[in-house]
Amino acid sequence: MDNPSSDPLPSTLSGEEEKPLALLPPVPRGRRGRPPGGATTSNRTLKSSLPRKRGRPPRSEQETPLTAPVDSGGSSDLLLIDDQGVPYTVPEGSAADGPQGSGSKRAPHFCPVCLRAFPYLSDLERHSISHSELKPHVCKDCGKTFKRSSHLRRHCNIHAGLRPFRCVLCPRRFREAGELAHHHRIHSGERPYQCPSCRVRFTEANTLRRHYKRKHPELVGMPVRLCPPNPRTQPLWDDDEGIPVQEGVQEESPEGKEPTWPISSTTSPLSGFTAGGSAGAGRGQEGQDTLVSGGIPTMEGDQKQGPKPLGPGAIGHPPVD
């Protein structure tokens, strides 16, 4: 047998060896031994052509959504799978509108009762309990059933006697944060419920509903909504009816006490002193006695008369000889 090593090389290789190798011109070195910018560009091109590390495909190969064309009567749709493994279809033009998981890409699930849309099927199943009589959450202490787990936790606080929410202004405690927020309106004076007819504000929604029945029967059944706070200074309110108290009206004084009057630095309502400070009665028109009280002259013939100055004959003493 012939030795395979003794076979002559192909003519192509022998021809290539006969050609002289072209020597590249020396590349000038830059400062600190770095080549000029042209060599750096070639190195970058070389790095991009090298194969990447194992387990890391190039970026062009990384496709985030798993897509597949779906034939839907002539219109091309895409079948996408979200991060939870739920498939959904979207039009082909809307696949590049936003990032994955956006509301425009995910096909909503509609409730057949109220036509409310949900992004996930699990949300729709949780919502469907509100339209049924199913109450899967049962209290272990009393056996009462609830539709939501949050309602069961709130009910369990009654058996445990827990009131974790405490008011910072008074020692009262509450089971829920909503009850504490409602209680804060008592301290702040906020009245977020306003009557649309007479513009009267109330603290509670039930008080506004009672106001509808008493004052505006045509508004009974109207939904009660929160209104924005009034930027103007709110007047005083009656606690029961919510009727604003008229300012400037004198309130009834308690029994046995004189009503309070505003006292200024120049006038006094106690006696008939003039603005100059002299006591006694002055002389008005037509010779009638007038009394200056608070800077306002009062005639004797009027219904409202001020206190008259006492003369020497008004004192009940025996006459002096």
UniProtKB/Swiss-Prot annotation:
First-listed, main subcellular location of the protein, grouped into a coarse class: nucleus
Residues annotated to bind DNA: 49-59
SUPFAM superfamilies: beta-beta-alpha zinc fingers
Gly residues biased stretches: 274-285
MF term (GO), any: sequence-specific double-stranded DNA binding
Zinc finger (C2H2-type): 109-131, 137-159, 165-187, 193-216
Summary of the function given for this chain in its UniProt record: May be involved in transcriptional regulation.
Protein name, UniProt field: Zinc finger protein 524
Organism whose genome encodes this protein: Mus musculus
Gene from which the chain derives: Znf524
